[in-house]
Curated annotation (Swiss-Prot):
InterPro entries in the cross-refs: Coagulation_fac-like_Gla_dom (IPR017857), EGF-like_Ca-bd_dom (IPR001881), EGF-like_dom (IPR000742), EGF-type_Asp/Asn_hydroxyl_site (IPR000152), EGF_Ca-bd_CS (IPR018097), GLA-like_dom_SF (IPR035972), GLA_domain (IPR000294), Pept_S1A_FX (IPR012224)
KW Heme (keyword) present: no
Enzyme Commission (EC) number: 3.4.21.6
Active site: 251 (charge relay system), 305 (charge relay system), 402 (charge relay system)
Domain of life (superkingdom): Eukaryota
Major site of localization recorded for this protein: secreted
Assembly and oligomerization: Heterodimer of a light chain and a heavy chain; disulfide-linked.
UniProt modified residues of type (3R)-3-hydroxyaspartate: 103
Name this polypeptide is given: Coagulation factor X isoform 2
Taxon lineage: Eukaryota, Metazoa, Chordata, Craniata, Vertebrata
One function term, GO molecular function aspect: calcium ion binding
Entry's Gene Ontology BP terms: blood coagulation; induction of blood coagulation in another organism; proteolysis; venom-mediated blood coagulation
Residue ranges annotated as propeptide in the record: 21-40, 183-209
């Protein structure tokens, strides 16, 4: 019986073999469904692994959302996506004149430097006097949608419409004798943004004056005038404006009864023993506030500290006697007073309460921002004043320099920008020289210089 049962089982197994074989081999459509590669989901660990952007968007095509997940930063994502979609539009450097290119999808954007415009920054902008002074050498003004350059008196506008050409041998503001690799400055210094200068050497030259200026060689400060009293000698300075007008400080006029003028000299002993130029008339600003009036009426001392001296006979110009140029108010404010330094000169004391210098001294002084100026001063600083000088270095104008020139050089031309006026002592730490701001008085100066007055006995007037 057992053998029969075994045989029965074997026959049943053999009968079922064809059905089993047919089930092993699947139809092609069904098989393809199993062989298709399905995109695996990113694991949490993978999302935070470095190099994840390569797996997401280089090995495979990704969406912007997936790129954002990889970068975790909107700006980086945007930069990547603009290049990823259609390539880098900035690769050809399409922006001219150092413009900065930013790629976009199907486009790019150029951010132009100041003075340039256009899609590719290809157009040079000289249409604004606020951009490099309109490329004008001297004065710039807007005329409709354009700019117009002009020059100081005694100069001719160049054929290019921008440059200024000296029209004579003694045009204003030009040093006929220039320094030979020598600055009207001092030992080496490094300037900080708040006009505090850091010394490179602890041993300044022993032969430095104004307070700590340098000798102004003959012909290097040709606009310097010296005001002389017959008893006191040189007591103030001035600036030559024209053959018959000299600019000075109003408070100098109150210091003496008799005033004479000397020009073209750098040695005080020669000034006080040589020929003097006679004064015809003196114009003192009618709003000038002397210290005694300031204390009495609670006003700002030395406000409107400006005066003009009219000579009896014209000053003879030479290589040692040249006027400083008179700027326009806008040129002074927007261009000159935004330079780093101005230049002052005089025969004043070599230190506070010290002796006066025997020779003409000159010093570069940095402009000081208005807030620092006002905070540093115990007396009011009005809109008619500005500060210049050093925070901690002992370099300053001093008593006896009053009325003298503060000039600023632009394109090798010296323009008068201030008058030495006042200050708290000389070269004190944290204190600056205070100057009359010339740009406030251009109309007043021009009004006086336009007058054609006959020669009269010496007199003082107020305008």
């Amino acid at each position: 019986m057992a053998p029969q049962l075994l045989l029965c089982l074997i026959l049943t197994f053999l009968w079922s073999l064809p059905e089993a074989e047919s089930n092993v081999f699947l139809k092609s459509k069904v098989a393809n469904r199993f062989l298709q590669r399905t995109k695996r989901a990113n694991s949490l660990v993978e999302e935070f692994k470095s190099g994840n952007i390569e797996r997401e968007c280089i090995e495979e095509r990704c969406s912007k959302e997936e790129a954002r997940e990889a970068f975790e930063d909107d700006e980086k994502t945007e930069t990547f996506w603009n290049v990823y979609v259609d390539g880098d539009q900035c690769s050809s450097n399409p922006c001219h004149y150092r413009g900065i290119c930013k790629d976009g999808i199907g486009s790019y954007t150029c951010t132009c430097l100041s003075g340039y415009e256009g899609k590719n920054c290809e157009r040079v902008l000289y249409k604004s006097c606020r951009v490099d002074n309109g490329n004008c050498w001297h004065f710039c003004k807007h005329v409709q949608n354009d700019i117009q350059c002009s020059c100081a008196e005694g100069y001719l506008l160049g054929e290019d419409g921008h440059s200024c050409v000296a029209g004579g041998n003694f045009s204003c503001g030009r040093n006929i004798k220039t320094r030979n690799k020598r600055e009207a400055n001092l030992p080496d210094f490094v300037q900080s943004q708040n006009a505090t200068l850091l010394k490179k050497s602890d041993n300044p030259s022993p032969d430095i004056r104004i307070v700590n200026g340098m000798d102004c060689k003959l012909g290097e400060c040709p606009w310097q005038a010296a005001l002389v009293d017959e008893k006191e000698g040189v007591f103030c300075g001035g600036t030559i404006l024209s053959p018959i007008y000299v600019l000075t400080a109003a408070h100098c006029i109150n210091e003496t009864e008799t005033i004479s003028v000397v020009v073209g000299e750098i040695d005080k002993s020669r000034i006080e023993t040589g020929p003097l130029l006679s004064v015809d008339k003196i114009y003192v600003h009618k709003k000038f506030v002397p210290p005694q009036k300031a204390y009495k009426f609670d006003l700002a001392a030395y406000d409107y500290d400006i005066a003009i001296i009219q000579m009896k006979t014209p000053i003879q110009f030479s290589e040692n006697v040249v006027p400083a140029c008179l700027p326009t108010a806008d040129f002074a404010n927007q261009v000159l007073m935004k330079q780093d330094f101005g230049i002052v000169s005089g025969f004043g004391r070599i230190f506070e309460k010290g002796p006066k210098s025997k020779t003409l001294k000159v010093l570069k002084v940095p402009y000081v921002d208005r807030h620092t100026c006002m905070v540093s001063s115990e007396t009011p600083i009005t809109p008619n004043m500005f500060c210049a000088g050093y925070d901690t270095l002992p370099r300053d104008a001093c008593q006896g320099d009053s009325g003298g020139p503060h000039t600023t050089v632009y394109r090798d031309t010296h323009f008068i920008t201030g008058i030495v006026s006042s200050g708290e002592g000389c070269a004190r730490n944290g204190k600056y020289g205070i100057y009359t701001k010339l740009s406030k008085f251009i109309p007043w100066i021009k009004r006086i210089m336009r007058q054609k007055l006959p020669s009269t006995e010496s007199s003082t007037g107020r305008l």
